[in-house]
Amino acid sequence: SIKNITKNTIFVIEASSYQLEYSKLFKSKYAAILNISPDHLERHKTIGNYISAKFKLIENQNSNSIAFVNKNDKRIQNKIKMNKYKSKIIKVNTKINEKFINIFHNEYFLSSSNKENLSFVIEIAKKFNIKKDNLINVVKNFKGLNYRQQIVFKNKNISVINDSKSTSYSSSMEMLKKNNNIYWLLGGMPKRGDRFNLSKNYYHNIRGFIFGVNQKKFILDLKKKIKIKKFSNLKNALN
């Protein structure tokens, strides 16, 4: 609650490109940009505009600030090279050793996107002098966030995963590569510039159940790649 806020309270804010685009006053002591892929182009129009919006996080910082950026993301590194920023830039290597991942015994971090998230957690934890044992304990017991690769049911035969936060093909790739015999429910609003770039090696694992008013667009994108069925709404798809 507000009553418990002190000068040492740490606020963690997930700021979207929409919020950052026109931001002039928002300034953080620590900032992190994990990755950049073509997204929200229906608003930003170009990938360049989208990158500029995300980099407001760093542009608004001062010399006492620290920015964590993905060392392995070409778009991020190109932007860093082309500009000078006041804050200290820490480049995070997201290629975590598999043996290191096994320390945590948490299947949530087996996907490459969550390995990427974990690599940032580790680097930021170092800056806050968090003890290694405390970090390991927290990560071991982390259950994940709602709607983000969230396992809502599991037995020996089936896992039901809610990944509805993935609102584009690119953000869905990890789940499609990570699992076998996938029954993929998809609908909603297609995103401008979005491409289904999954390797052909995974096509045989996936069956698409497409629903909603925009199903024609999804069918056009997927019909030559994976087996699909179409439905008028989610209820019919589930039945």
Regions found by a protein language model. Name each.
Residues 5-91, 96-109:
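Flexible active-site lid/hinge loop adjacent to a nucleotide/diphosphate
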Residues 67-71, 185-186, 205-213:
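Short internal beta-strands
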Residues 107-205:
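Nucleotide phosphate-binding/pyrophosphate-handling subdomain across enzymes
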Residues 22, 56, 78-79, 171-175, ...:
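A short acidic, amphipathic alpha-helical/loop segment
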Residues 86-99, 136-140, 150, 228-235:
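Beta-strand->loop->alpha-helix junctions that form or flank phosphate-binding loops
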Residues 27, 83-85, 178-179, 204, ...:
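Short, structured coil segments at secondary-structure junctions
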